[in-house]
Amino acid sequence: MYITAEAIREIEQKYGSPSVIHLAYEMTAREFKMVRRSQKHGRAHDVTFFIIERNQVVVIRKPMYPEGAYRAPSGGISPGERFEDGVTREAYEETGLEISLDNYLFRFRVKFTCGEGVIDWTTHVFSATATGGRLEPVDTHEIVEARLATVDELAGNIREALIRSGSTGLRYRAELNDIVVEKLINRGRLLPRDQD
């Protein structure tokens, strides 16, 4: 596992203890293999960051996503890499922005299955603030677009595009968005729909 228990304790001391959510999804064989391929060296995590700017959230679109399907940027921490260094590296690669983490919001414990196969996955979710840079992906092989999205878009057109894609992984991201945006509204970090 790339992220040690000690690293998580340090992150929780600095950014707070997250709410833990358990989810389960049955995947197609194709999607399951794609997740399996991402598990080199035992990786079983991603860090997702909701970068908030002017009551909007930074979202990204990957080349294989259908038009209109966006999600919060995310990435993996490399073996031996400091947690915060990995997050800032991923944020810069995917969005062109320099960020600082604000709060550790959620730890999603997800069980992806395909027949008898099981992948236990953890998504660490943070709120973040842009501190510099320009909103434009640096790693253009992995990310084709980065932009700001309103709460209305996240709950409306973007959510619909993620679900309509038929991808279990994108359905998971739609549900993750719903849960995180609700918490950000409840904490006053985002204004509710139609109030921005």
Region annotations inferred by a language model:
Residues M1-I3, H141-D196:
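Nudix hydrolase/Nudix homology domain
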Residues D46-T48, E98-L101:
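Conserved beta-strand residues within beta-sheet cores
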Residues Y104-F106:
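Residue-level detector of beta-propeller blades
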